[in-house]
């Protein structure tokens, strides 16, 4: 169940309120076994009115301890390369497919994605971004509803209903592979070019 199941932007409440409501429903979630080993639920963070939403895989150790996505080494990398797209962390919204850390940072299991994905879909519906950047295979597979690998999907934009989707490498993987880091940076420059060519309506009139 991916982004294509979102029929339209139907939230009547302000986006900030809608996100608070989703987080309240999430509460002390025990819909899968990950609650047994987590320290914190990592809901998401950022600008509720962001044009660009980043979706990663799952919290890592630092994220689990601090309760915020992308705060470890991968987060530092993400913060740095956001500037290549003309963005700052406070401009975007960041979330993960899973809200709890899988033990040993293993890949999400299908039953975990099934349990957690309704919360992500509601976050997407509330924020209603123009662009979704999927970081790594699990997020890309969820959003684009495909099993094709990230190396074949990155480097271009994909239209999924209202949303423009840009798949790219997860910063954690790119930190282990200099060639992927270069491609990740290329993708962020491409994102910046796209944003310049497609300004937000309020920007276009300036």
Where are these regions (language model features)?
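A polyanion-binding, active-site-adjacent surface
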Residues: 2-206
């Amino acid at each position: 169940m991916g982004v294509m199941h979102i029929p339209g932007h139907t939230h009547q409440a302000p986006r900030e309120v809608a996100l608070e409501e989703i987080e309240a429903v999430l509460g002390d979630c025990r819909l899968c076994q990950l609650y047994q080993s987590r320290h914190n639920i990592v809901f998401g963070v950022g600008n509720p009115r962001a044009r660009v939403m980043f979706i990663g895989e799952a919290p890592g150790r630092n994220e689990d301890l601090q309760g915020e996505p992308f705060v470890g080494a991968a987060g530092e990398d993400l913060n740095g390369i956001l500037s290549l797209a003309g963005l700052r962390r406070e401009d975007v919204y960041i979330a993960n497919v899973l809200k709890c850390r899988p033990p040993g940072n293993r890949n999400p299991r299908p039953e975990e994605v099934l349990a957690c994905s309704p919360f992500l879909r509601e976050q997407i519906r509330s924020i209603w971004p123009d662009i979704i950047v999927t970081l790594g295979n699990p997020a890309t597979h969820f959003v684009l509803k495909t099993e094709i690998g990230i190396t074949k999907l990155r480097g271009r934009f994909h239209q999924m209903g209202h949303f423009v989707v840009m798949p790219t490498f997860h910063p954690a993987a790119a930190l282990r592979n200099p060639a992927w880091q270069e491609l990740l940076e290329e993708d962020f420059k491409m994102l910046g070019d796209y944003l310049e060519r497609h300004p937000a309506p309020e920007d276009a009139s300036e």
